[in-house]
A protein has these predicted regions:
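C-terminal alpha-helical cap/extension of soluble enzyme domains
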Residues: 227-231, 239-311
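Alpha/beta enzyme core
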Residues: 4-12, 27-52, 59-76, 84-209, ...
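An acidic- and aromatic-residue-enriched active-site/binding cleft used to recognize and process polar
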Residues: 136, 215, 260
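Basic/polar N-terminal segments that are highly enriched at the extreme N-terminus
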Residues: 1-4, 311
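Conserved residues at beta->alpha junctions
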Residues: 24-25, 214
């Protein structure tokens, strides 16, 4: 088994009415927690790397860690660049062995988005990789992605068919109300995704895989844990899991999850160090953090995404 593209994963997911989890990775423990969960659930998985994670962990280390996870689990694992902002970055990741890249030109005018996406598609396809593109702009902050609420915009369903046909992209991220980071909705408001947009997009692109970014649910037990042990995250709210389940039953084949993993790791480490103030062995607190990431991912795979047993 080697690193695979998402093409077969998405075809099966679309036909089966479930979604694949795309989890952001930064280090060994996060990769291990995710892939151990996927192995126990016999689930396909996408490990995705932001440009910030690539800088932090070193591009060679990350690729080799993912290759090790493939060997260790025997699972189909897709290695994906999240939010590539240039042709040069996408090309570098394809050259490094990524099987999938995202070119995010969603903030550019439509014609510029088409042109840049097409350029990335031509290079990636020539080298055996697939491409995710984006129409519509999500608000929020996550790594190098910083978009103010007033600069965000829903995807226009009337644009999607032309965009996909002209670019040749393999999947499309759309904006239907999710956002990046841990503060997705204002306290006191009812979170609600625009399923009407999703349904119209899927009607215009039958059988085509749709992607949801910014889909962490922000588990309140970890928010409370962080706040209890020295942190400050008032008003952190995520996407309700029942709405993600609904999206997975429709045309959404890839659901991106990052903040939930960060919360699980940070909350666990804060709690452990507060309860063991004399401890200084990183294995003692990184081990429990890895285990809680594993349990969180198992929950997502089984109870939200529905991709258990689909590897």
């Amino acid at each position: 088994m080697s690193i695979v593209t998402s093409q077969e994963m998405f075809a099966k997911a679309y036909a089966g009415g479930y979604a694949i989890g795309a989890f952001n990775v930064n280090n060994m423990e996060i990769i291990q927690g995710i892939t151990e969960a996927a192995k126990e659930c016999n689930a396909p998985v996408i490990l995705q790397v932001s440009s910030g994670a690539r800088k932090y962990a070193n591009r060679t280390y990350l690729v080799k860690l993912v290759e090790a996870a493939v060997i260790e689990t025997g699972l189909p694992i897709c290695l994906h660049l999240d939010h590539g902002d240039s042709f040069e970055l996408c090309k570098a990741c394809v050259d490094d062995g990524f099987s999938s890249v995202m070119i995010d030109a969603s903030s550019k005018p439509f014609e510029e988005n088409v042109a840049l996406t097409r350029q990335v598609v031509e290079y990636a396809h020539a080298h055996g990789a697939v491409v995710e593109a984006e129409l519509g702009t999500l608000a929020g902050i996550e790594d190098d992605v910083k978009v103010k609420a007033e600069d965000s915009s829903y995807t226009r369903p009337e644009d999607v068919q032309e965009f996909v046909e002209r670019t040749g992209c393999d999947s499309l991220a759309i904006a239907i109300g999710t956002s990046h980071g841990a503060y997705k909705f204002k306290p006191g408001t009812k979170p609600q995704l625009r399923f009407d947009i999703l349904e119209e997009v899927s009607e215009r692109l039958p059988g085509f895989p749709i992607v949801l970014h910014g889909s962490s649910s922000v588990p309140q037990e970890y928010v409370q844990m962080i706040n209890e042990f020295g942190g400050s995250m008032p008003g952190a709210i995520g996407v309700p899991e029942d709405q993600l389940r609904q999206a997975a039953r429709l045309a959404v084949c890839k659901i991106n999850i990052d903040s939930d993993l960060r919360l699980a790791m940070t909350g666990t480490i804060r709690k452990y160090l507060a309860e063991h103030p004399a401890e200084f062995d990183p294995r003692k607190y990184l081990g429990p953090a890895r285990e809680n990431i594993k349990q969180l991912v198992k929950h997502k795979i089984v109870d939200v995404l529905g991709c258990d047993g689909k590897a």
